[in-house]
C-alpha cells in the first residue's frame, strides 16, 4: 500500500458539510484505509483576480493508505467532486469541494492531467499547515525537504487560520489529526 495525502477545500454553501462528506467518501474507498485527518483551516482564496464576494475556503488534508493507482485515484476524486456538485467548468473559482492528490508515496508523475507531487503545494500554507499536522517529516521527493521545512520556507502571505470551534464529524468522530485506530 502507498501513503497518499489528499488536500480538500470548500468555499461554497455549507463548507463544513461539504468537507465532511468528502472525507467520509474518502474513508470508504475500497482497497484503502484512512490514516489521519487534519484540523480544518480557514483560508482566503488564492488567485490573481479575487472576487470580493468569494468566500473563504475551509481546507484540510487526509492521509490514506491505498492500493488504488494514481490515475484511478484521480478519477475517483473527480467522481466525488461531481457527487458533491462541483462545477466542472469552474476550475479556479468558488467551489463546493476541491480534491487534490498532494503526494502519492514517493512517486513523481508528470502526465497530461496528472502531476504528483502537486506542483504548487510547496508554495501554499493552506496545504502545508494541515499536512504538517499529519506528517511534518514527510519529504518532498523532488525538493528533498520535509513538510516542516517547506512550511518554514513558504512565502505565501495569504491568511490561514485554524477554524474554531472545530466541528464534530461523521468519519469516526475524529475532527483532528490522530493516530489510526488500534495504533
Regions found by a protein language model. Name each.
Residues 46-57, 68-74, 79-183:
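Flexible, gly/pro- and Lys/Arg-enriched active-site loops
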Residues 11, 37, 130:
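Residue-level signal for inorganic ion chemistry
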Residues 18-19, 143:
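Residues at alpha-helix caps and immediate loop-helix transition turns in enzyme cores, especially N-
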Residues 8-12, 46-48:
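A short secondary-structure junction motif
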Residues 14-16:
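Short N-terminal binding/cap micro-motifs at the start of the first secondary-structure element
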Residues 7, 63-65, 104:
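Short hydrophobic/aromatic beta-strand micro-patches
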Residues 21, 26-69:
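Short, surface-exposed acidic-centric catalytic microdomains
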Residues 1-6:
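Extreme N-terminal starter segment of soluble prokaryotic enzymes
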Amino acid at each position: 500500500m502507498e501513503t497518499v495525502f489528499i488536500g480538500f477545500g470548500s468555499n461554497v454553501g455549507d463548507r463544513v458539510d461539504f468537507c465532511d462528506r468528502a472525507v467520509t467518501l474518502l474513508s470508504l474507498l475500497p482497497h484503502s484505509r484512512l490514516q489521519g485527518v487534519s484540523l480544518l483551516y480557514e483560508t482566503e482564496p488564492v488567485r490573481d483576480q479575487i472576487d470580493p464576494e468569494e468566500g473563504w475556503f475551509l481546507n484540510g488534508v487526509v492521509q490514506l493508505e491505498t492500493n488504488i493507482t494514481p490515475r484511478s485515484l484521480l478519477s475517483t476524486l473527480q467522481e466525488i467532486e461531481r457527487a458533491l456538485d462541483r462545477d466542472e467548468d469552474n476550475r479556479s473559482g468558488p467551489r463546493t469541494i476541491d480534491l487534490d492528490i498532494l503526494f502519492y508515496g514517493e512517486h513523481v508523475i508528470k502526465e497530461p492531467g496528472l502531476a504528483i507531487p502537486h506542483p504548487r503545494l510547496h508554495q501554499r500554507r493552506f496545504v502545508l499547515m494541515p499536512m504538517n499536522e499529519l506528517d511534518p517529516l514527510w519529504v518532498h521527493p523532488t525538493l528533498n525537504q520535509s513538510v516542516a521545512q517547506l512550511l518554514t520556507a513558504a512565502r505565501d502571505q495569504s491568511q490561514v487560520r485554524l477554524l474554531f470551534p472545530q466541528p464534530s464529524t461523521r468519519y469516526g468522530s475524529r475532527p483532528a489529526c490522530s493516530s489510526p485506530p488500534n495504533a
